[in-house]
Design a protein with these regions (language model features):
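Short, hydrophobic/amphipathic alpha-helical patches that form generic packing surfaces
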Residues: 74-85, 140, 144, 240, ...
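N-terminal helix-rich structural modules
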Residues: 2-197
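Charge-rich, well-structured scaffold segments of protease-associated domains
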Residues: 149, 156-170, 354-361, 607-610, ...
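C-terminal, non-catalytic "cap/extension" segments appended to globular domains
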Residues: 3-31, 37, 41, 212, ...
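Short pre-active-site segment immediately N-terminal to the catalytic Zn-binding motif
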Residues: 441-466
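Active-site-proximal, well-structured secondary-structure segments within enzyme catalytic domains
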Residues: 134, 138-139, 177, 183-216, ...
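Short, hydrophobic/aliphatic alpha-helical segments
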Residues: 251-262, 433-438, 480, 643-645
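Short His/Asp/Glu-rich catalytic/ion-coordination signatures at enzyme active sites or charged loops
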Residues: 19-34, 83-102, 124-163, 216-251, ...
Length: 681
């Protein structure tokens, strides 16, 4: 799916014809050495483009200089994206290990580029007098990133920064790998402890030869236990197993990483890593993040106290003498309360959400919203589990991208839910490709082709699918830009969760849900009455959800907004939790060791809550009677999604809304359950 442009092709750059690392194998099964060679070709192409950039004579223009820089960036992005994918999904551990090594090597090349004074000088000299706004934005943002990297420091300081970034990358990769491969199991000796779990869950978990049941901390095993299991003991065991799956390995790694990041920030003249990490974001500074946190705290405090009080009152009726509810009881007691207050049992909708129908529903929704078509492709993926789809524009013929769905758990695979670039799109050169790496329940068939397990999903799973697909469409439709450096996800980091959280909101529409939510056995459409109960029950607990986001947001900021020397991670996480959460802390909880967002987002986990405010304001502009076909849908694609990173996030907000985001839509969403009258059973 590559197209040569500007007289520069992959062959000229000296790379193989395989744009995908998993196709660079003579045998059809990628080896560690073949991956290493594939990455080496891409790094060599990157270096060739930089050499050509520095050799340009005369007046520097976007086409003779920025184009070469962008191609160099494109080659690093390509190598980095696919090394990252294989690090997360490769079935062969040797390939995963090699992918991690390659990710480190690619990061080193990126750091060297960011500290290259000659390149900075060349980019600074580009004549932008006739350049487009997007080109100006690209150059200005790139030059800022160079200054924030320390390109203006002396040779010794830049060498030290290079070493520190190399160390930080290695620590981050190892932290993530420990989470990925850190799954634990718990053994259930008594079947009575499984009471409350769905029938299809029990059917998948038959006793072993000793008569015991073995459960894992993978999402399809863990989430139902935390939501439905009546046994306090089982929930607490699962909670602790899940929150210690990368402990103690990641404890010291995190401490070392915090110290390394702080040293980088200090060398660059910042008081903390948080101030460095927010300097080129929409938020701008750690102080602005704290102001936002304070506003969220005030907005959610009363609602969260009310929600907890109502659930606790109900729980005490079920368990007389109960004083407090602990962290392992949160999902369970919310589920029980919703059954009582709203006559809604979340198990009741699971039969309407078999995986295959949900997938089709998400595809159909996105196709209508964005005016595209999806066509299953025979192109190879990185594993036999992967489904591949081509994206066609509104005419049904023009190919605009491709995506890969790797949606179910397997050994060695990353345990979370994420969207990832695969090929960075550049207009006229590469069509964009992206992938989803998820862990939804796997449908099963017997040898006769009869479905034995439909892979029933909880409604929160369906919301997650919509969320990740929002990222995917951002990568594809935003990947038609002139420059790789502005393609797809290349917005400010604290704008990136807007498209994902926007698409979540479409799950609340009755007509949209009924278009795909059908009972896996009878074909019955999900009743409107049940949808209404689901929506009302789902609205209850939003303030509590915001408090959870506040906890993660404040923790990520606090860890990076001070000198980490002497930080006691156990004390910090517990103390902060108890200041924000009414649910009793469980001793032995080491959640920080598996808080993977500390790697990619570092101090900036606030992105989720900040972008929720923007996304809800965006969604409020859509016509509820015609969500997928209203004028706002077309405007959203044009003004936001298709832009990729071609405009600053602040400008995209103003282009779509005609103003800055406001808090009112978020406040309405937050208080929706309490604002509605006569909604309880």
């Amino acid at each position: 799916m590559s197209v040569a442009t500007s007289g520069i092709s992959d062959s000229v750059l000296g790379v193989s014809t395989a744009i995908h690392a998993w196709e660079a194998s003579a045998s059809g099964s990628l080896t560690a050495d073949e991956l290493k060679n594939w990455v080496s070709e891409r790094i060599a192409a990157h270096e060739s483009a930089i050499a050509a950039l520095l050799a340009v004579e005369g007046v520097r223009t976007p086409e003779n200089s920025l184009r070469l820089y962008d191609i160099a960036l494109e080659q690093l992005n390509l190598a980095g994206a696919q090394a990252g994918v294989l690090n997360s999904v490769a079935a062969d551990k040797e390939v995963r290990d090699q992918a991690q090594d390659e990710a480190q090597r690619i990061a080193q090349a990126g750091t060297a580029l960011s500290l290259n004074r000659e390149v900075y000088g060349a980019l600074s000299a580009i004549d932008l007098s006739a350049a487009s706004d997007a080109t100006r934005h690209f150059v200005e943002r790139t030059l800022l990133s160079y200054r924030l990297a320390g390109v203006d420091k002396d040779d010794a300081t830049r060498a030290h920064l290079n070493q520190l970034h190399e160390k930080a990358t290695l620590l981050s990769l190892q932290f993530s790998r420990n989470i990925q491969e850190g799954a634990k199991t718990i053994v259930v000796h008594n079947a009575d402890q499984l009471d409350g779990l769905p029938a299809d869950y029990l059917a998948r978990h038959t006793p072993n030869c000793d008569g015991h049941f073995v459960l894992s901390t993978d999402q399809p095993d863990m989430q139902p236990v935390m939501t439905f299991a009546k046994s306090d003991d089982l929930r607490e065991r699962m909670f602790l197993a899940y929150n210690t799956r990368a402990y103690p390995a990641n404890q010291q790694i995190l401490m070392d990483l915090l110290a390394t990041r702080q040293e980088i920030a200090t060398l660059l003249g910042f008081s903390s890593w948080a101030n460095l990490a927010t300097a080129d974001q929409m938020m701008g500074s750690a102080a602005n993040v704290r102001s936002f946190i304070a506003r969220l705290e005030e907005a959610s405090r009363t609602g969260a106290e009310r929600e907890y009080g109502m659930v606790l009152e109900y729980a005490r009726k079920q368990q007389p003498g109960l004083k407090v509810m602990n962290a392992a009881s949160r999902g369970y007691w919310y589920e029980q309360y919703r059954r009582e207050a709203f006559a809604f049992d979340s198990q009741s909708v699971r039969p309407y959400f078999p995986y295959a129908q949900v997938e089709q529903g998400v595809l159909d929704t996105a196709a209508k919203l964005f005016g595209v078509h999806f066509k299953r492709s025979s192109a190879p993926g990185w594993h036999e589990d992967v489904s591949v789809f081509d994206v066609l524009d509104i005419d049904g013929e023009t190919l605009v991208g491709r995506f890969y769905l790797d949606m179910h758990p397997r050994d060695g695979k990353d345990k979370w839910f994420s969207a990832t670039p695969v090929v960075t799109g550049v207009r006229g050169r590469y069509l964009p490709e992206a992938g989803l790496i998820c862990n939804f329940p796997r449908p099963e068939m017997n040898e006769a082709g009869v479905v034995t397990d439909a892979g029933l999903m909880q409604y929160n799973d369906v919301v997650t699918y919509f969320h990740e697909f929002g990222h995917l469409m951002h990568a594809i439709l935003g990947g038609q830009t002139e420059w790789a450096g502005l393609s797809g996800f290349a917005t400010e980091g604290d704008f990136i969760e807007v498209p994902s959280q926007m698409l979540e909101e479409f799950f609340r529409d009755v007509a949209l849900l009924q278009s795909f939510a059908r009972h896996f056995e009878t074909g019955e459409v999900l009743p409107a009455e049940l949808i209404q109960k689901m929506k009302l029950a789902g609205a209850f607990g939003r303030a509590d959800w915001v408090r959870s986001q506040l906890y993660y947001t404040t923790l990520s900021l606090d860890l990076h907004d001070q000198d980490p020397t002497g930080i006691d991670l156990d004390k910090v996480t517990k103390s902060l939790y108890e200041s924000l959460q009414p649910w009793q802390w469980i001793e032995g909880n080491r959640m920080y060791a598996s808080f993977g967002h500390l790697m990619g987002y570092s101090s900036n986990y606030y992105t989720y809550a900040f972008d929720k405010v923007i996304a809800l304001d965006f969604f409020a502009q859509f016509d509820p009677a015609n969500l997928l076909g209203c004028a706002a849908a077309t405007k959203y694609r044009k003004a936001v999604i298709e832009q990729g990173g071609s405009r600053p996030g602040r400008q995209m907000v103003r282009d779509f809304l005609g103003r800055d985001e406001e808090f009112s839509a978020f406040s309405d969403w937050l208080n929706e359950e309490f604002a509605a009258a006569g909604t309880r059973a």
